[in-house]
Amino acid sequence: MKRIYLIALAAILLTTAVSAQRPVRFRNETVDTTRITTALIELDKKKKPMPQLLVSEAGKMFISTPYAAGTLEESPEMLTVDTEHLDCTTFVEMATAMAITVANRRTSWRDYVYNLQQLRYRGGNVDGYASRLHYISDWIVDNSHRGLLQEVTDRIGHADYAVKTLDYMTSHRASYPALADSANFAGVKNAEIGYVSHGFPYIKPQNIKNSDIREGDIIASV
């Protein structure tokens, strides 16, 4: 069966950063806060004129970080910061949060932590497992609505729409240990309800042109 790739491009917009108030789970607080502060200072020195260019530069700083899946799955749910292990999602979130922080002329790890929380959780609020934006499509929609990202897929002339229902997690409950908890399951199910027969913009790979993609764009392939 031919595989179809759904591609979303997002350009970073400026937002106001303030210090985080919620508890944070660091993998190693001294190492993490030092690495974040150092990276933010170095990123600020680059003086990039557009925030999305900062995403690219931040990504380059951590491109060699060892891959590790499941780093966010500890209980209870709280913002987790781990600069020594990243997966596809946490890599993008880290680069984006750093870009937003520096774009706002901040170089404090506390401001970075705040921006990371804003990106990772629905409405920027940590309220249990279900408040995390588990689906990349939901992540794009929620952050776009709050002005942290700008969805630009449908602005490209050869973009199309696919009607999809987000229900993979609750349809594969056994694959997600946290969903054994009935409250977590109900919360994720409630989030999925907002995406029943939802129209998602996408571009087929053969229709992508180099001129459509700018440095720092976030591209999600499914």
State what each model feature region is:
Residues 1-24:
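Bacterial Sec-dependent N-terminal signal peptides
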Residues 20-222:
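Cysteine-nucleophile amide-bond enzymes
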